[in-house]
């Protein structure tokens, strides 16, 4: 039984060593992907800023991506225009509140 465990441990060690070289290549690809995501994150629209022209470009909040929320504004001339801003929807606010409350209770 001891021989089987030793052989198994050697096989696991060899497999993990050989796969670690492949993981290094994956880590380089992931790093490039993360750098690209960081660039798009810099170009996103922050909370409470106008998103009328780019309704899918809102940034991420603490837990969720902000949503472009639109309202119809009537000017003094009676002209209706749509104005949009990035914000947190009510159901996301409730979820963030519950998570914050849970963190306070459970540490």
UniProtKB/Swiss-Prot annotation:
What keywords were assigned to this record?
Disulfide bond, Knottin, Secreted, Signal, Toxin
PROSITE patterns noted in UniProt: SPIDER_CSTX (PS60029)
UniProt KW Signal keyword: yes
Q: Which GO terms describe its cellular component?
A: extracellular region
Please name every pair of cysteines joined by a disulfide bond in this record: 44-59, 51-68, 58-86, 70-84
Kindly list the places in or outside the cell where this protein is found, as annotated in its UniProt entry.
Secreted
Alphabetical list of InterPro entries matching this protein? Spider_toxin_CSTX_knottin, Spider_toxin_CSTX_Knottin_CS
Q: Which residues form the signal peptide?
A: 1-20
Presence of keyword Signal = yes
Q: Which residues form the propeptide?
A: 21-41
Q: Name one GO molecular function term.
A: toxin activity
Q: What is its main location?
A: secreted
* Superkingdom assignment: Eukaryota
Q: Name one Pfam family in it.
A: Toxin_35
- Tissues in which the UniProt entry reports expression: Expressed by the venom gland.
What the record says about family reads: Belongs to the neurotoxin 19 (CSTX) family. 04 (U1-Lctx) subfamily.
- Free-text note regarding domains: The presence of a 'disulfide through disulfide knot' structurally defines this protein as a knottin.
Per its record, how is this protein called by name?
A: U1-lycotoxin-Ls1e
- Look up and give the organism this protein is from: Lycosa singoriensis (Wolf spider)
